[in-house]
């Protein structure tokens, strides 16, 4: 028996927020780290099956992936120093990404900055802010970053 879709769970919510699996609703939403998003944007080579499945579900609008603003800023810096080639401006990259409503920008808040400052998986400020976003949303983080996985404060998917 396939999963039946629920309507929006709250005012303004999308029908992508949850699916029914048996008697319990299971959220189909994730937070992305920078590296897996860039792998997906460049064709998906190097993603694990589970991570690729999350992005595939998002592309099919069967899941939501939240993109922390720290991911966009890190992407900008990586492009600026030549470590990644977006093939276009960051603005065009973001416009293309967010043209699919299943990709949702997640704004940085003062609370996330405080959380990142108080508890971080390593010395990388982007990892700290991205993990703070996942903690704030209480959603799993798509990442293969070993220190984040070992940290254990954030559920990870890889």
Where are the language model's segments positioned?
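Short, structured coil segments at secondary-structure junctions
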Residues: 101, 151-152
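Active-site regions of enzymes building and remodeling cell-envelope glycoconjugates
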Residues: 153-158
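ABC-type ATPase nucleotide-binding domain
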Residues: 78
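Alpha-helix capping/helix-boundary segments
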Residues: 36, 71, 112, 130, ...
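Active-site neighborhoods of divalent-metal-dependent phosphate/nucleic-acid chemistry enzymes
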Residues: 19, 24, 85-87, 99-144
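Short, well-structured N-terminal submotif of metal-dependent ribonuclease cores
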Residues: 1-67, 81-96, 137, 147, ...
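Phosphate/NTP-binding elements of NTP-utilizing enzymes
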Residues: 75
